[in-house]
Amino acid sequence: MAIADVFDGVRELGRRARGSYDNANLWIGPELRESDDWHDFLQSAHTAIDALDQADKSVDALVQAVAADKPEVVVDLGDISRRLHELAENLKLIIDGSDEHYVYSLQVNRRLRAGGESMTAERIDIGEALANEWLPEVHTAIFASATMTVSKSFEHFNHAVGLDRIGASTSSSLHLDSSYDFDSNMAVVVAGDIPDPRDRERYLSALERVLVDAHLAMGGSVLTLFTNRRDMEDLYARVEPKLARAGLELNCQQRNSSPRRLRDRFINEPTSSLFALKAFWEGFDASGETLRCVIIPKLPFSSPTDPLSCERNLREDRAWARYSLPEAVLEVKQAAGRLIRSSTDCGVLILADPRLVTKGYGKKFLTSLPTTSYQRIESAQIGHYLQLWRARHERRR
C-alpha cells in the first residue's frame, strides 16, 4: 500500500507538466521541491522508505531462520533483500536530491489510468564518469563514427565521452572525408519560408503542400522524420488521402506499431513512403531506389522542459549552445545519413525549418552536412525543383 501511494503521488505531480502530449516528463528541480505538492508527496515517500527498510529486515531475519533447513531458498531470498534495499536507496537518492552528479525527474504515461509512473535519477555528465572511472583503466580506445563532429570539430564529442578531461597528450583525433561523391549525388534543399509553428494552421498548411508536392514529384520513396507525434499524425491525416488518390502508399509510425515491420514494408515496397519518429532518425538502412528523399520538417532540439536541459540551464549560462545545439546537429547528420548508404545512391534532403536561414546557428547544421552546398527554395517551388532533379539523375543512369 505504501508503494502504491508513492506512484499515486507521482501521477499527481505529473499533472504539473506543461506542454506534454501522452507522456509527462517533469524535472524535479528547485521550484517543484519547494511546492506544497512536493511536501505532500514526501510524506508518502518517507512512509514507503520505512516500509521497504522494514521488509528488508524481515527478509534478512527469514534468511537466518531457514538457512540451515532450506539452504536452496537462501539465494532467492537474498535477491529479494537486495532489490528491497536498492529500491529504498534509490527512492532516498531522488527525494533527497542533493547528489549533484544526477538530474532528477518523474515520468507519467497519461494514456494509462495507472501503472505508467516512474522516477529517475540520471547521471548528468557521463564524460566525467568515463574520465574518472573507465578511461584511466583502458590501454587503447578507438571511437569511430560518421557523425562525431559538428562543423568538423570534435569538441562536443570529446566533452561527451570525457576525452577533454584526461589531458590533450593522451588522445588524438582525425577527420577523414568520405569516399562518396556527396556533391554529385546528394542535394540539400532549405525551405526558408515555412510559417512559425505557433501559427499552427498556416504552419500545417504550408508543410502539407511541401509534403504532397515532394511525394508526387519523387513518385514515393520518401522518409519524413518528425520530432513529435502530434505534428506527424495531423499531417498524415491531411497528406495520406491525397497521395492515395495519386496511387502512392504512405505509412505512419502509429502508437504501438512495430518499427521493424514498418522498415520491412518500406524496403519491400519501393514506391511506399513513411512518416516516422525517433526510431528512424538513425540506424535505418534503405539503399538504392528504396529511399530517394528525406524530409525533416523541424530541427530536433530537445524540449526546453526536458529535465536534462532544465538542469543544465540551471548550472551553466550557455548550456543550450554547448549541449542542445550540437546534439541537434548530430541528429540531423544521422538523419541525412539515411539517404546515401553506398557510392551509387543519390537523393534529396529537404529541411523545412526556417530557422536554418533566420538564425545564426543555422550555419552549424548546414556546414556539418556531407555536401558542401545547399539550395534555398520557396516551399511552393520545391515540387518543380524535385521534378528537375529527378529527371537529371535518371538521365545519368
Regions found by a protein language model. Name each.
Residues 1-397:
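ASCE RecA-like P-loop NTPase motor cores
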